[in-house]
C-alpha cells in the first residue's frame, strides 16, 4: 500500500469512531486507521491468505500471519481482532453502527459483493465505504461488484483506493 493510500485512510479514520477493515493481512493499513481514529478498528481477516499469497505463506508455520499482525499492531488497544470469514464476522457484529468500511479482502466478484452486502447494513448514512486495489486491468470481479452495488464510487487520485459516501 502506497503512502498516498495510507494518508487517505488516516484522514478518513480521523472522522470515524467505528471502522471495519476487511482484509488486514500484516496490519499496515490497520495501523493507519487505528493510529488516527478516536474510536475502534475491527480488523476482519482469516489470516490464512489467498492463492495469490500462497508462496509467501508456504514459507512459514501455520498461524504465522496472525502472529505477525499482532506483533505489528502491539500496543494499540483500539483494535478488535475478528478472526474468521468476513460474512460470518458481519453476522456476529450485526449490532454495530459503522462510520467507515474499508474492503481489502477477497478481490473476486463474490468476495467484494458479499463484503458489501454483509457490512453495509451497519454503515450509517453518510458513512464511508471504500476499498483497495481498483486496478481495471487486473481485478475484473472487484470492478463488476462495485459497478453493481456502489455505482457512485470514485477513485482517489494517485491511488488504487475506491470510495463512496453511503446513502
Language-model regions, residue ranges each:
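S-adenosylmethionine/decaboxylated-SAM
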Residues: 4-167
